[in-house]
Regions:
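Gly/Ser/Thr-rich phosphate-binding loop
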Residues: 255-263, 272-333, 345
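Conserved AMP-binding/adenylation subdomain of ANL enzymes
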Residues: 194-211, 218-260, 273-274
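ANL superfamily adenylate-forming
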Residues: 123-167, 274
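Conserved AMP-binding/adenylate-forming core of the ANL superfamily
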Residues: 33-77, 81-85, 102-107
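Conserved pre-ATP/AMP-binding loop-to-beta segment of ANL
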Residues: 30, 157-175, 182, 205-211
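A short helix-loop-beta submotif of the ANL/AMP-binding
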Residues: 68-69, 75-95, 99-103, 108-117, ...
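Conserved ATP-binding/catalytic segment of the ANL
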Residues: 62, 73, 355-360, 364-406
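Conserved AMP-binding A3 loop
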Residues: 42-46, 171-198, 327
Length: 406
């Protein structure tokens, strides 16, 4: 049985990622786009778009473009979005690296992705220098002052138009740990990421000027898409946190009148139980959205009761750009990951027999839609094991669908 979304079908625009993300930048020129939570340092939409185009111009002048890969290994800071979209505007591909990786793990990703430039911060420079040995990386740049080249050295004459590439070209290469061995490069195209941004507006619409408090790392697909790209495309204000600190999170949520918090289950636990929460005014909070790992119904209820707002879940994976299920406002159900987002299909399949299962029966979740990756980089076997000939992505996760489509 094929399950379809309860929400109306949508049309996916035939556009590239960064033009889509910058669609409101001109109109919102003087509005804050990115704010460093720790210092208050701000990039307006005009400054953000200008920096993206200057970086793309600098990359193009170096002969860096389609088919080339720039790696980013940095915490969440405003310049992360500049490096990401400057690379995309130049027609190239970004691979995002977990800064907590060992030098060996970083080296694997640099080699496997074919990265030739690396953007990092001074704190991670020693690991970066060790990791680039024996890879194709020719130069390291840092966002903050260090003994490496500054990221500003990548800036050049602004490139006013996006370099022409196909929406089916790969723009992002996050790495997914998968279940075995070293992580695998997940090829995500412009079309994949734009599709998921449009699909999720039905459930994650952002008001212009609304603050998105962003401590979920941008190297991870949840932070990259649901926070950074989603908020910027809709005219939101992305307030970055380099790492999670409960007190700073609560202070920023209070100061910036945060309406929706995007978190993972350990943060829900803190919001439900930590005494610090009582010291801050979180009365503007309308919902807490938890992803990245399963959230128990009891904990969600406890946090919701304390905060006086909905605590809901979504579901996705890197290979799905990332969202396939989410909970629209007013549709909360305890323990549910929500309903299918628009233009997405799913099946619940018996992993032993491959037969479709009925309502209420647990089986493997399969997903099909425009957000499904074309495959893993340099790994046809893993791709064939994950996506079948009919385009169904076999998630490896177990769940069931109830009578209400949850």
């Amino acid at each position: 049985m094929i399950h379809t979304s309860l929400l109306p079908e949508i049309t996916i625009p035939d556009t590239l990622l960064t033009p889509y993300v910058l669609q409101r930048a001109e109109r919102l020129a003087d509005t804050p786009a990115l704010v460093d939570g720790a210092t208050g340092r701000t990039l307006t939409y005009a400054e953000f778009a200008g920096a993206v185009k200057a970086m793309a111009g600098g990359l193009k002048a170096r002969g860096f473009g389609k088919g080339d890969v720039l790696a980013i290994m940095a915490p969440n800071v405003p310049e992360y979005a500049v490096a990401f979209h400057g690379t995309a505007w130049a027609g190239a591909t970004v691979t995002t690296i977990n800064p907590t990786y060992t030098a060996h793990e970083v080296q694997h990703q640099l080699k496997d992705s074919g990265a030739t430039l690396l953007v990092t911060v001074s704190m991670f420079l020693p690991i970066a220098k060790e990791a680039v040995e024996g890879t194709g990386v020719t130069e390291i740049f840092t966002i903050d002052p260090s003994d490496a080249s500054p990221m500003t050295a990548l800036m050049g004459e602004p490139l006013l138009e996006q370099v022409e590439v196909s929406p089916d070209d790969v723009v992002a290469l996050p790495y997914s740990s998968g279940t075995t061995g070293l992580s695998k490069g997940v090829m995500l195209t412009h079309r994949n990421l734009v599709a998921n941004l449009v699909q999720t507006t039905a459930v994650l619409a952002v008001d212009e000027g609304e603050t998105m408090l962003s401590f979920l790392p941008f190297f991870h697909i949840y932070g990259m898409q649901v926070l950074m790209n989603n908020a910027l495309a809709q005219g939101g204000k992305v307030v970055t946190m380099a790492r999670f600190d409960l007190e700073q999170f609560l202070q920023l949520a209070q100061d910036h009148h945060v309406k929706r918090a995007f978190v993972a289950p350990p943060i829900v636990l803190a919001l439900a139980k930590h005494p610090l929460v009582e010291k801050y005014d979180l009365s503007r909070l309308e919902s807490v959205f938890s992803g990245a790992a399963p959230l128990g119904a009891e904990l969600a209820e406890e946090a919701a009761a304390r905060l006086g707002c909905e605590v809901v879940q979504g579901y996705g994976m890197t290979e799905l750009s990332p969202v396939s299920h989410s909970t629209p406002k007013g549709m909360y159900k305890p323990g549910s990951i929500g309903i299918l987002i628009p233009s997405t299909e799913s099946r619940i399949v018996d992993p032993e027999t491959g037969k479709d299962l009925g309502l209420g029966e647990d089986g493997e979740i399969w997903v099909r839609g425009p957000q499904v990756m074309p495959g893993y980089l340099n790994n046809d076997k893993a791709t064939k094991d994950t996506i079948d000939d009919e385009g169904w992505l076999h998630t490896g996760d177990i769940g069931h669908v109830d009578a209400d489509g949850h």
